[in-house]
Amino acid sequence: MYGIIATWRMALEGISKADSMLKNNESAADSIEEAIKAVEDFEYYKSVGYGGLPNEEMEVELDAAFMDGDTLEFGCVGGVKDFANPVSIARSLMHYDANNFLVGQGAEKYASRHGFERKTMLTDRAKIHYHNRTKEITNTELKPYSGHDTVGMVCLDHDGHMTSATSTSGLFMKHPGRLGDSPVCGSGFYVDSFVGGASATGLGEDVMKGCVSYEIVRLMKEGMHPQQACEKAVHDFDLELKRRRGKAGDMSLIAMNNKGEWGCATNIEGFSFVVATETQAPTVYLVNHDEDGKCTFEVASKEWMDNYMATRTAPLVRK
């Protein structure tokens, strides 16, 4: 059995590529890296990689992580500017005994020394988004922070090896240097090949308060199906944050166990995810949730899929 699951519709092309690789007995590590890179390289996905939305100083700062479920080794980078594929940099850090999590200039120096591709990641399209949002904030006192759609994945190969990886440009209009949950082991991602893995998307500052990805893996280790584990972890922590703070940020989690069974839970409307297994072609699901945290899925319609791409590739006009 093999399988791969990812946050958001934007992962579909990458998941399709990984599905083909896994069918050909390629590793979970190589398959998930290629899947994440496909998202990083597509400029119309504005929360990851090339074309990612900038911080408040109009700089694109990228975060990424990679974890091996066999060894529990991980590599992470944060606040990286002008490198094409931060997930590949993160993967390369995984095998060191120390210095596995590098940020800012330190991460960039490491990437340069090790020959990773430099690339100007701020696109003209992202500049238009920035200028339009700046004007909206000035005119209407809108909250600047929005757009925190991390691509996160969990992968299982034919040999039972599991991996997890994430990549994001973080909150739109974030303070320079801000890091969310995406590169933080246990919060944005976690995987154990003896159990399974999970990955998060949403408001990182809140996801980190509960180490929600690790919590889902812990619940699976206790015997819960991935769907039960996701629903319990997300709903319980959503309630806990509201009890303590009166509010909870966006949280959506995906998971897969070492049998290829999968699950998803969210506290928002409009969440989508993609899954492929040995017995299921790459499929986009839309998620609905009730007040008790129970989630139901429906396959995205052709109309929904067409509208998704049309919206993201539509021409932009500077206001």
Describe every region a protein language model picked out.
Residues 1-319:
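Alpha/propeptide regions of enzymes that mature by internal proteolysis
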